[in-house]
Amino acid sequence: MKLIVATYGTEGDARPFAALCRGLMDAGHEARLLADAATLDSARVLGVPTTALAGDIRGTLGSDHAIAGVVAKGGGFNDTARALAKIANQNAESWLRTIIEAGRGCDAILVAGLAAFVGFSAAEYLGVKGIGAGMIPITPTATFPSPFLPPKWVPRLFNGASHGFVNAMLWRAFRDKTNAARAMFKLPPRKAVWTGHPMVYGVSPNLLPMPADWPANAHLSGQWLVRSPVWMPPPALANFLAAGEAPIYIGFGSMTGFDNTRLLDALIEAMAGRRVLFYPGWSGIDPKALPDNFLAIGDTPHDWLFPRTAAVIHHGGSGTSHSAARAGVPSIVTPFAGDQFFWAERLRLAGVAPAAVDGRRPKAEAFSSALDLATAARMRNRAQVLGEAMRAESGVANAVVALERIVAS
């Protein structure tokens, strides 16, 4: 079986697909990952063949671009959809051409993220199966609202309808440029978004129970990750961990555009007297501004680091949310945009996180109260139970089996 995976997003979006590709290769299949050049390092480390898609995701997420403004305003759906569509629309024709070239001779194309619509178009052009994949559960259900809408916005009665609304709005934002790219390859215009295709999710059924009303072609396989190779921490990190009690981890991944000075001030005040590991990521926060109880760190494997922490303060991306839960430690979530509000609520419902802290108006008191709840025995015990269940999952292996069945059908 030969598959290619086409996705576009941050490094955190690409990393699970690198793990999935490695799992496919270990099962005797061919796999190749297509993504932004800056997000392919994890695939290369795993020996996964890669092809770069046009674009500059890190530059696009910088503080002077539209998506940063969306974050600053609080992640409204319409603004988010337009800002994200702008990224894909600028590259639609190039992406479609690259995916078609890489996909010649393949059995199926897995599509995700901002490359999904052109990915399905490439599968149509090549006459192969298009399979949706990802870490955000977008298959319609009455169990929960669309992950792209803050849960508190949607009355339960409208959960099912919210998915159709979001799909229609997303397609409206992507449609014209997607159809223009399709026309370059003599494909007819699409009037509506793709539906009815198989979906494979790198999502834990222990964190998000499988909805009873999902179709048979939607699969929750568990988190996609491969255990990090033997990893040695830098001396500064090793010494810090050995010098005292388990620290608090703070990191907001690829998020930019928020009021980082205000947020950092609130965190520094709330963390007074505590040991803290701080990962600046793409935030633009200067590590020189950190007090002595903070240690700034670089990229560190979450599966190595998080079990050594007392709690994880993060933005609520699917990958970080899963990794913290899998490590058996509580989370404190400060969501900014997109599906981050959804994962903040899933962690709260699972009993492993307090209510989310507002990142637009961060207050030290809010972080202090959340940290008291997160480090209390009840939440720590619940996190340990959930972590044990998630570590027993075989997310990559389950996804490989599901894909084998889908392609063979």
Features from the language model and the residues they span:
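Short, polar loop motifs at secondary-structure junctions
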Residues: 34-40, 114-118, 204-207, 280-286
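Conserved nucleotide-sugar donor-interacting segment of glycosyltransferase catalytic cores
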Residues: 90-160, 206-207
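Conserved nucleotide-sugar donor-binding subdomain of glycosyltransferases
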Residues: 66-118, 158-195
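Short gly/pro/ser/thr-enriched loop/turn and capping motifs at secondary-structure boundaries
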Residues: 40-41, 57-61, 136-143, 147, ...
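Conserved nucleotide-sugar phosphate-binding/catalytic loop shared by glycosyltransferases and other
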Residues: 34-80, 155-158
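Donor-nucleotide binding loops and adjacent catalytic segments primarily
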Residues: 203-311
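Nucleotide-activated sugar donor-binding and catalytic core shared by glycosyltransferases
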Residues: 1-11, 16-32, 38-48, 80-83, ...
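Generic beta-sheet signal
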Residues: 34-36, 53-56, 112, 133-134, ...
